[in-house]
Design a protein with these regions (language model features):
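Short linear sequence motif anchored by a di-proline
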Residues: 1-199
Length: 199
């Protein structure tokens, strides 16, 4: 499961590229300082875009914690997308999670080696992307989780699940709770991702 992402894209580029959706983008808490981060892990804050919660037309970009405590105390940082619709309730809904890379780990070939191999996945044709997420109000404040689906051919050699990465054409559709999640939560086609070994 995905528990580490990269976000080095500048806020200005996010704002400019999001204009493609023709959805006004607001910053109700002020423009966040999106310092480039090579590693964002569970419980770290990251930028999300969600339908406006202040009554303004459009969407808003805020930073929120990744994961919330589950009933067993373990962090809910990924959630399976299959069989669910993920509409909006008064305490949460769909969001886009901003990143330009994510990491997966594989076991070393040598069974005596303790350190796993680390792989960085990036989009071949885009500088950054949005992952399908859910946000909600929790005991630790507002937080988000990432949705997962079956792996596409680029990820299958490394993991048996993949995060849901949305095409730019689907950003606005994901923020619309009337669009069925199953229409959007699909594996990526072959050749969408580049992969590089980090260690």
């Amino acid at each position: 499961m995905c528990n580490e992402v990269r976000r080095t894209v500048a806020l200005g580029q996010v704002r400019d590229d999001f204009s493609f959706t023709r959805i006004p983008l607001h910053f109700p808490e002020g423009a966040p300082n999106l310092a480039p981060l090579e590693s964002i892990r569970i419980t770290d804050p990251n930028a999300i875009i969600r339908p406006s919660t202040t009554g303004e037309q459009g969407a808003e970009l805020v930073t929120r914690r990744w994961s919330w405590p589950g009933p067993n105390g373990k962090p809910v940082f990924n959630m399976r997308s299959e069989g669910r619709d993920f509409g909006f309730s008064g305490t949460g809904g769909r969001c886009l999670v901003v990143a330009d890379g994510f990491y997966e780990y594989t076991a070393p070939e040598d069974p005596k080696a303790k350190r796993k191999h680390k792989w960085l996945f990036t989009m071949r044709s885009e500088d950054w992307f949005c992952m399908a997420g859910l946000w909600r109000k929790t005991d630790v404040g507002e937080a988000f989780t990432l949705l997962t689906t079956a792996p596409g051919p680029d990820i299958e050699p490394y993991h048996n699940r993949q995060i849901v990465i949305l095409s730019r054409d689907d950003w606005a559709r994901w923020l619309d709770p009337g669009v069925p999640a199953a229409d959007l939560a699909k594996p990526l086609p072959a050749g969408t991702l580049d992969v590089a070994q980090i260690c």
